[in-house]
Amino acid sequence: MFAKETYVARRRQLKESVGSGLLLFLGNDECGMNYEDNTYNYRQDSSFLYFWGLSYAGLAAVIDIDEGREIIFGNELTIDHIVWMGTQPTLHEKAQRVGVTETLPLAELKKYVEKVVAQKRTVHYLPPYRAEHRLKLMDLLGVKPGNEMPSVPFIKGIVNLRNYKTEEEIAEIERACDVTAEMHLEAMRVLRVGMKEHEVAAALEAVAQAHGCNLSFPTIATVCGQTLHNHYHGHTVKEGDMLLVDAGAETAMGYAGDMSSTICAGKKFTSRQKDIYDIQVAAHQAAVNALKPGVYFRDVYDLSCRVICEGLKGLGLMKGNPADAVEQGAHAMFFPCGLGHMMGLDVHDMENLGEVWVGYDGQPKSTQFGRKSLRLARKLEPGFVLTIEPGIYFIPELMDYWKAEHRFTDFINYEKLESYRDFTGLRNEEDYLITATGARRLGKKIPLTTEEVEAMR
């Protein structure tokens, strides 16, 4: 937890941004896996963490801008709770740690909201992403699930604070990135032909645990790298395979790291793997070199895509003008996803608040296949923390689909592409902070080139 002054200042800035009304924060509850008392690992709502700092279940909070009140709602622990959980701080003690002096029982929240509604004042709330939040909004405001109308001023106020990382946040994110790097280095050290994917996943996840961290998202450790988010870990690693690892640590304060690496199963990459890998690295480095304030991230994405197309053209897999191929969307055969995303208290920071505000600054998103998956497109500014993760993927089903529809035949050499059906896919990912003059990698460096990876094997 940061000093209470941090949370006081954040709430003050948010009040000034929104201007009037009641700001409603719904904290997360415990969630049972298969019965009520056997719960998933608890994770507080990130905006609740950002403004209130308390990672406890069963809380809600309001900022009443018009009346100048900040209240945390929750129930004190009973003797039964203490028997099972031990002595805990009181709700009032927890609130004081984040600069809040007023607390009320959770049952009082509905009465407070009803009073505000009766006064014809605005109740601002955020997009619900959990069923429990939808039910609470229905109880508090009579809003049926699916009919929510989240407050745009509230969303924009939060985005305009959380997008810009402070020095104390950057230090916490860097810690997450350092642990994340150690996770990937461990995967490179332990991987052997004959292992199951889940053995590698277990080894790298143990590193996070050993550093007192959780995972920032479910680990990807797969020999089927053509599947972008593959959480299956049951394959046996064979000679000639590449293992794609996408994994990250989350600190006790909730800040995330997110890196990817692609590792040869044996001691060396094959010549064909190295050819594709080198193109990916070139696209990665081009994107990193372009990072600086004032640059639109969509332009960095386009640059990375052009480098990929140029490289694949050199191998005979693509043809024509790379810039035209990217403009028309032919690159998405090999790169059907985005280049990166914002990162902070969420690995995809504030994705629950809407990409249109977080990554696009209110501007519309493209509907083009591949480009529509770009989570970040806006102009870069100092304080932004983001990922760089271009990839090259050979997806047999997509190859067959586009070939049958004769898509982009001016740019894609389908005959040559057939020999790459079994290639799978690869990506590498690093985390960057936009500075006043450029960008700085966060966390310990992990191997990026084929030579660097092979040196770890």
Pin down the residues of each PLM region:
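Active-site neighborhoods and metal-handling regions in enzymes and metal-associated proteins
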Residues: 1-457
